[in-house]
Amino acid sequence: MSGGPMGGRPGGRGAPAVQQNIPSTLLQDHENQRLFEMLGRKCLTLATAVVQLYLALPPGAEHWTKEHCGAVCFVKDNPQKSYFIRLYGLQAGRLLWEQELYSQLVYSTPTPFFHTFAGDDCQAGLNFADEDEAQAFRALVQEKIQKRNQRQSGDRRQLPPPPTPANEERRGGLPPLPLHPGGDQGGPPVGPLSLGLATVDIQNPDITSSRYRGLPAPGPSPADKKRSGKKKISKADIGAPSGFKHVSHVGWDPQNGFDVNNLDPDLRSLFSRAGISEAQLTDAETSKLIYDFIEDQGGLEAVRQEMRRQEPLPPPPPPSRGGNQLPRPPIVGGNKGRSGPLPPVPLGIAPPPPTPRGPPPPGRGGPPPPPPPATGRSGPLPPPPPGAGGPPMPPPPPPPPPPPSSGNGPAPPPLPPALVPAGGLAPGGGRGALLDQIRQGIQLNKTPGAPESSALQPPPQSSEGLVGALMHVMQKRSRAIHSSDEGEDQAGDEDEDDEWDD
């Protein structure tokens, strides 16, 4: 039960082990105890960690926005008979955000400390303060998803096979002729006995098997004669083709979904930007939904036009796509020396370069083409961003001059200025800094608000294209799966080794 002792202990004799709340190693005992009291009646946290919550909000769905900072719990909700990822605020003392675990949820780990998945409304990202807690959280969530998928696939395999045709018609047929014609009446007939059928002796000696052999073969029936009398179609009757139109093949099969090994490059780019995984492409129902969406939008040609239209936005591979991903917020320096920005919202695109001390506002306000020459590979240390983020603000008009002046160092990075440590973080490790953010509470939520809102304004046309529309379709699909699986989960979603407490 919530609020119980931390850790686990075995139950009484003959009873299964009683599950207990799992605390966070970064929180103090009284903070963990307060967190357990917020879980609710008969709710257990199977994994607890200190995180920042990032969301890719629907208007653009291309940029991460920091929403909350607190303790995330993987909750086993016995009254609802389901699992939830819930974020609690220790300062506010309440639930800040939650996402129910549905069957087709894909829990991805672009980095060991930043995990992403598709929520009911948008893409969500968890930035963990401790990688050990992140690893334990990921292992538990993926284990539950795998068990649920295996159980559903097992139910599909247990469906009864299609009924086979009955052999009633054969029972009324004649048995095969005896091997020895004209045999003795007392002789054992070979053919009928081999089939287990009752035999009747023929009393008329004139009727023998030789008479049956001499019968002529039956001639064609009148119906066959009528069919043979029909006029055959010759080549002269076949007209020339008309209305020919070349239609590109999308590579979708109703049974197996999309062929992920032979996908068109433009389709692969579209799916990657929309955050669609290979498991969703090979799922029959999900791939059918994606295929119908592509056909409604104009087929493969429309996808190619959309990709060509967005082609100039991302720069060449060296800058690692800094052009269309500049407003991404940086991450807090980890306890294991990690540095760099958050991964992009669309899964599959290479993560952006580390956070340098270049001028974030010019890179954000200007058009996407200017940032490409920037390498963005310098300044990987977390301390420089908060201190040097202010000076470069005056020179937004001349972004080109900085690159030639000092090579790779002051190059304007394609990263957002909304730095999380701006609220007074210590430059020392991310563990203490993130804990300070949690204890400060709501004040930190306001720091990225104004810059991030302005960052979402520049790319309206690209975000509302096929990529944004497809992401909305997949979000509706996840909500539909969530609602349809709710009844099934309540009916029989108990794991083999996990029983719900009533």
From Swiss-Prot:
InterPro entries: CRIB_dom (IPR000095), CRIB_dom_sf (IPR036936), PH-like_dom_sf (IPR011993), WAS_C (IPR011026), WASPfam_EVH1 (IPR033927), WH1/EVH1_dom (IPR000697), WH2_dom (IPR003124). Residues 238-251 form the CRIB domain. PANTHER family: ACTIN NUCLEATION-PROMOTING FACTOR WASL (PTHR11202:SF36), SPROUTY-RELATED, EVH1 DOMAIN-CONTAINING PROTEIN FAMILY MEMBER (PTHR11202). Residues 486-502 have a biased composition (Acidic residues). This is Actin nucleation-promoting factor WAS. Changing E133K: In WAS; severe form. Residues 39-148 form the WH1 domain. Binds the Arp2/3 complex. Interacts with CDC42, RAC, NCK, HCK, FYN, SRC kinase FGR, BTK, ABL1, PSTPIP1, WIP, and to the p85 subunit of PLC-gamma. Interacts (via C-terminus) with ALDOA. Interacts with NCK1 (via SH3 domains). Interacts with FCHSD2. (Microbial infection) Interacts with E.coli effector protein EspF(U). Expressed predominantly in the thymus. Also found, to a much lesser extent, in the spleen.
